[in-house]
């Protein structure tokens, strides 16, 4: 009985505090922005990937085999990047280079998909998105909280991970439905690709602004970022 009464109240309080922490802190707001842009792009890339598979394989069993093999490869790529690439990139180019790696690679892969649509280019685009999201992007994003007060980190991460991710993923799905409703069938893939490029442009811009904000914090306030106007 005690848990049924206390846990919902704590969850509501945490959600409110997390949102207030993000909105009141420019640094945390930028962290939330890059995390949410990542989730906004995911359903767009996923739709194009699954559409390419459906076009290539008419047999359900063949699709299942391909998807199973693909995700095994993508998991291996993510592990290899985390072990071999992420430490080197962070050491020589810094955290922001790690944050920029995913949107830049998604841009390149999407351009390849626009130039040559098909299952191979769609697979490369999927790996550029989720393969880097599960490895270098996540590792880079976690290091951003080092300069933040632990309580603010707890509140902000709770909101970003539990609410922000889901909200923007749903919003991304809504964008797909909008494209499907208003674009000719032959242009859906291209329109989704161009929309992906547009979101990545805002994503990269947010990373650049975040880098400047991080430098400003380090120069003006070496202490944890409790309150950034």
Residue ranges and their predicted role:
Residues 1-229:
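Membrane-embedded alpha-helical bundles of multi-pass transporters/translocases
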